[in-house]
C-alpha cells in the first residue's frame, strides 16, 4: 500500500527531525573479522587470569563469531543476551568485552569538534551482578539511576536475584525497572543468564520480554560447564 502525498509526508518528516538526533549505536570501530580476533585475544587473557589453560574449540569459535557480528553489524539492536547453562563461558565473554572496550578507547558518536579528550567522551563499560543491582535499588536510588544511564552496562547472572523485593512496605522490581530504563534510552546492555527465553518471559513479564527481543541479540551457549578438572577451558563465573 502506497502512502498518499508521499513527497509531502517526506518533507514533514524532515521538518520534524529539526533539532532531534538519533541515539548512536555502540559499534567496534573495525571489521567483523578484526573484531573476532580482538575478542579472541581478550577472551584468552581472561582465561589466563584464572590460571587456566585455554584450548580453542568449536563452541568458543561460534560464540565469538556471533558476538563479533553483534558488535560490528549495521543493525537497530543495542544489546546482547548471553544465555545457557552454568560455567560455560558467559561471564568470561562479558569481562573480555569490558577489557576490550577499555583498551580501545572508543570515542562516543555525535561529539562536537571542540569536545576535547575528557574521559567522559569515551565509552566505558560497567559490570554489575544482578544481586548487587537489587541491593543498590534498595539502598541508593541515585546510584541505581546512574547505573541505568551508564554508556555500556553488563549485568551478570540475571535470574539469580529476587524478582520482587519489599522495602518499608513498597514492592520494587529492580531488574525490570533497570532494563526498561535502558530500553527507553536505547543504551547498550549485555547480560548473562542461565534462564531459557521462556523463563525470562515468565519471570519478568511479556512487556520486558518483548522489549528484550527488540533491543538484544541472543547468543546461546550450548556447551557443558568448564568448571571440572577434565574440562578443556575455564570460565569466569558465568
Language model feature labels by segment:
Residues 87-90:
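Conserved glycine(s) of the Walker
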Residues 112-183:
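Conserved nucleotide-sensing/catalytic segment adjacent to the nucleotide-binding pocket
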Residues 93, 97:
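Hydrophobic positions on the alpha1 helix immediately C-terminal to the Walker A/P-loop
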Residues 82:
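Hydrophobic anchor at the beta1->P-loop junction of P-loop NTPases
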Residues 99-102:
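Walker A/P-loop NTP-binding motif
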Residues 79:
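Walker A (P-loop) ATP-phosphate-binding motif of ABC ATPase nucleotide-binding domains
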Residues 1-76, 229-238:
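A short, basic N-terminal segment
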Amino acid at each position: 500500500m502506497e502512502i498518499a502525498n508521499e513527497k509531502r509526508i517526506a518533507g514533514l518528516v524532515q521538518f520534524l527531525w529539526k533539532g532531534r538526533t538519533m541515539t548512536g549505536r555502540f559499534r567496534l570501530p573495525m571489521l567483523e573479522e578484526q573484531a573476532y580476533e580482538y575478542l579472541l585475544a581478550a577472551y584468552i587473557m581472561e582465561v589466563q587470569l584464572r590460571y587456566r589453560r585455554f584450548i580453542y574449540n568449536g563452541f568458543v569459535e561460534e560464540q565469538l563469531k556471533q558476538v563479533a557480528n553483534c558488535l560490528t553489524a549495521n543493525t537497530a539492536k543495542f544489546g546482547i543476551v548471553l544465555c545457557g547453562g552454568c560455567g560455560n563461558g558467559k561471564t568470561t565473554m562479558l569481562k573480555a568485552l569490558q577489557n576490550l572496550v577499555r583498551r580501545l578507547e572508543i570515542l562516543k558518536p555525535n561529539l562536537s569538534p571542540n569536545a576535547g579528550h575528557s574521559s567522559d567522551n569515551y565509552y566505558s563499560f560497567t559490570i554489575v551482578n544482578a544481586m548487587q543491582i537489587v541491593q543498590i535499588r534498595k539502598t541508593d536510588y541515585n546510584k541505581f539511576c546512574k547505573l541505568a544511564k551508564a554508556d555500556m552496562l553488563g549485568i551478570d547472572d540475571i535470574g539469580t536475584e529476587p524478582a520482587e523485593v519489599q522495602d518499608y512496605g513498597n514492592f520494587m522490581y529492580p531488574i525490570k525497572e533497570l532494563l526498561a530504563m535502558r530500553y527507553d534510552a536505547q543504551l547498550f546492555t549485555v547480560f548473562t543468564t542461565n534462564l531459557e527465553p521462556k523463563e525470562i518471559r515468565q519471570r519478568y513479564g511479556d512487556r520486558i520480554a518483548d522489549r528484550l527481543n527488540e533491543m538484544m541479540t541472543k547468543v546461546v551457549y550450548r556447551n557443558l560447564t568448564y568448571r571440572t578438572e577434565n574440562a578443556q577451558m575455564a570460565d569466569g563465573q558465568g
